[in-house]
């Protein structure tokens, strides 16, 4: 038997040893016949040329090692999904995919995957490859047949039923249902064209959802719920309350929390014998995009012919029901995982679907004004850039316009023409960095760096936020995006889609200020205070640390916040804790850095670095002298900290030992954080695993508590029939944001606070987690919670009658004072400067305010 191995570039790897192909004739080929450290480019590829001849037909099997050979010869991406599997492509039937054994040096957690790959390769070449069992799949294009099938499923014996949908868009308001897939048993599936979904068919679909005899299974439930509810009017409340509603994506997340591993295709490839069942669909998509010259992200499924769509769609639900039957028993064998799935993730999923569906209200008028002002400011910044002669000289020498977004041109300008000294910070490729941090440092050498920072900031605000939001607003004036439970290893929610609501600019209010409550409503934002430290105090059982929080609750005037108390203790400050924030703001920030450094496993050197960053930032803000924190200082601070909180130290050590000895750790709510690289020979990798595992138990305690509090509050609001008057629309980091009718704010606040502070076995007795309002008294007009009025008062006037009246009053008052002064002083009748100065006391945006108000 002749076997070939093809890899990326020349190397000394003994593939016969790695693949255990002893005694077989193995030839090794390299796509590039030279050693290569970077990316493989087209110009590097020599395989198949006279200098590097290769013909797969000379071999019984060809093992493609790594992503590059797999894509080049088998036409596919996703080597991790295909590793150990045989692939037919381009007339050759015996390509075998494999991840590279070189990965094991820096990703030892891949060893089980590679071992399974080797075992599968031996099965294939020795004729022991498992033959996939044939399935019963069919399309339904007749309404009567659709009704008959759905009725049959409803009347069948108890069992799981898997559903899926194919759609013309990613958001239910942007598109429509193309069809619905259903599988009522393994190795079976139908795809029903949406034209066949009559009232009778939809009626029986609802009957299936409500039937106690049926377990309802989806993969990525939240996505399909949007379309089923919006386009078919189906409801899932009964199935959810009876714990019959399931999501195989979340099931897999419970069993393997790593990112990027939860897609249906990947899971079907890994856990079933279905193989690459959507190959024809992917090929059509690729061919269509090439033929019509469109980007893959612009491709929509309504472009796929029905004959190509239905086999793929019908198999999706077969894959889903098989995965459910495989995953759920594993979860239900483990009490902690079972609790996490049923009590946290599934309620969270249903709740987040409601949150997404409500949308976030946007003031289009504010957004357009923001676009106008930002564009104006960007043009001014670009004009300022050209006042520096070095820019004009560079353009003249290179005979092309300078592009501030070109990193290459930026380096040439800053280091060759302006002559700045690089900061020492390098990119991954070893070049001098020009990121925001580097430009901030370079700004101390020359003002051009500050101008470039301003251009970069304004460009991002316009392109990433303003323009994107304007294109994404639904007809009701809201933007709808995604919140996800399965995208982080720690359990923190993430946001993506039309807008990442967790990455809105914090210090710049112009974007948040465009999230505006409708008339008669207010934006209410509540935020957990020092949440991760609080839960560390609870989980550790450190009475001294818990007492700090008890003091803060019982005597808030004397003990205002945790970090002030810690600064008072660590730095032995000669003042009351309540005065620390005012008298020693830099040391308070330093204390904060020490606390989080200790919790997240930083040593003295890293703590010293974090403290110095905090001190420098405060020095820049306040003008206080900067006094460096040395490593010796940091070591002393850590010792003082643990001397005060000894049980915290013992708990941290215990958690670290659990991770080192067992390679996993459970959170309070049952999350299992698996640290696959804990036994790595690289101490840096091992240390990162310990930090990651410990971080997860603290962060998940905070995020899960907040999520469950919001879920319970939302359920209570719905039970009171107030869902339209009190809408939770965002969960961002440690805060819950809602749109609430003005006369119900007090009631909403009571409901939310009570549910978030509910004792879930993770509270200090008599001292629940603190929760503070980010909003102004009585609620805020917009999500900036008052910052918009200070930073952009002209925009704040839009869609805010109350603030507009106030601003107009200031203008009238200034005008009256001007006329009075002019009447008294005939020699100097023009007192417009006084008028402007008086108004600037209210805002710095006089010209735009006058333009908008017509003043």
UniProtKB/Swiss-Prot annotation:
Keywords: DNA replication, DNA-binding, DNA-directed DNA polymerase, Early protein, Exonuclease, Hydrolase, Nuclease, Nucleotidyltransferase, Transferase, Viral DNA replication. InterPro entries: 3'-5'_exonuclease_dom, DNA-dir_DNA_pol_A_CS, DNA-dir_DNA_pol_A_palm_dom, DNA/RNA_pol_sf, DNA_polymerase_A, RNaseH-like_sf, RNaseH_sf. The keyword Nucleotide-binding does not apply. Its EC number is 2.7.7.7, 3.1.11.-. Residues 333-833 are annotated as: Polymerase. The C-terminus seems to increase the affinity of the DNA for the polymerase active site, and thus increase processivity and decrease the accessibility of the DNA to the exonuclease active site. Replicates the viral genomic DNA. This polymerase possesses two enzymatic activities: DNA synthesis (polymerase) and an exonucleolytic activity that degrades single-stranded DNA in the 3'-5' direction for proofreading purpose. The DNA synthesis very likely occurs by strand displacement. This is DNA polymerase.
